[in-house]
Amino acid sequence: MLVRSFLGFAVLAATCLAASLQEVTEFGDNPTNIQMYIYVPDQLDTNPPVIVALHPCGGSAQQWFSGTQLPSYADDNGFILIYPSTPHMSNCWDIQNPDTLTHGQGGDALGIVSMVNYTLDKHSGDSSRVYAMGFSSGGMMTNQLAGSYPDVFEAGAVYSGVAFGCAAGAESATPFSPNQTCAQGLQKTAQEWGDFVRNAYAGYTGRRPRMQIFHGLEDTLVRPQCAEEALKQWSNVLGVELTQEVSGVPSPGWTQKIYGDGTQLQGFFGQGIGHQSTVNEQQLLQWFGLI
């Protein structure tokens, strides 16, 4: 009886300690009424890093939480995951309105930054180790955050996204929008793209986020030219030029583009890959310096 009771208590204790995705309803300035979900592992690193993980169109925080193995890596490495969720525009992120494209002005971007600040305060997080990643619309928002809030994010990883400001002024940025100019590969000069980012935070002279850009070469929804344009943009902003192309990295069928010494900007293009998530958690976390 004693053994059985002890085992029952142990199981109950383990159940109570098991981390899970939790909604936070009050986290600060939230002009577009987006939702915040957070995953805090049971064993946190001292002054833990924070990753913002952004879902695609039609997705949700819960869907993206289950869509990668990042929660398992968080358990093993003690970092916090924030999963923003938008109920607007077919669950697509606002990447087109001036507010979200301008530092401190509003939009989805400001709500997400509020989530970051809340998390850093509540869990004594490391403000120098805040990162963003996302697929499709989430990748697009990752670029917006890196452009509008370079003082918040140390690095980003964009999967099947578009350049910062690519959809500026559009009525919406959903797959159902009649205006698909951006997603079909809108082209500008590197200087023009770079100016979009610099103008998002006028007068800012601090460091800029390190960026990785991933895209499938068979993507017809968001054309691979979009990734080329994003690389032009960040190459201009970060002041690095293409120095090397390596086949078979991170796996057969992929080509890696290295800019400068590779520490600030990298691009990856996959043969036979359409519009699909290609998140390699180990590669991502190595880029963020978390493993």
UniProtKB/Swiss-Prot annotation:
pH dependence: Optimum pH is 7.0.
EC class of the enzyme, as a word: hydrolase
GO MF term set: feruloyl esterase activity
Glycan-carrying positions: N117, N179
Cellular localisation: Secreted
Keywords recorded for this protein, A-Z: Carbohydrate metabolism, Glycoprotein, Hydrolase, Polysaccharide degradation, Secreted, Serine esterase, Signal, Xylan degradation
Presence of keyword Kinase: no
UniProt signal peptide: 1-18
Stated role: Feruloyl esterase which acts in synergy with xylanases in degradation of plant cell walls. Hydrolyzes the ester linkage of hydroxycinnamic acids (ferulic acid (FA) and p-coumaric acid) and diferulates present in plant cell walls. Efficiently releases ferulic acid (FA) from destarched wheat bran when incubated with an M3 xylanase.
PANTHER family: FERULOYL ESTERASE B (PTHR43037:SF3), UNNAMED PRODUCT-RELATED (PTHR43037)
Family: Belongs to the carbohydrate esterase 1 (CE1) family. Feruloyl esterase type B subfamily.
Annotated protein name in UniProt: Feruloyl esterase B
Gene name in the database record: Fae1a
